[in-house]
């Protein structure tokens, strides 16, 4: 095992080096955001508690300005993204748990196809921003709704 594997500190070494290098070159005028996985949803995989520890480390030790939380979807080997039958906001509970561990803004994503659900996430303080990926492609007017 090298200096980047094994312990939590070792696994966080590479992200810390990358973030420090970006901050050194960009200065404080650029917000640094990190996208992390909220949970793996598989036995032995990363849990929301693990992700909360990573999020806290990225904020406190690396100085990130915000976090973008996604969620691995490994329901089947052939499924690497949320199937159309999964409800919008399927990561909301995990996002909420991780948000409690940090003070930086949290961006969430996850099949938000109806604007009211995205608005609810922000209104309830469960996230600070909701990102629309595929939905923006399918419906470019989504932000105007």
Annotate each PLM feature:
Residues 1-145:
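Flavin-dependent oxidoreductase catalytic cores
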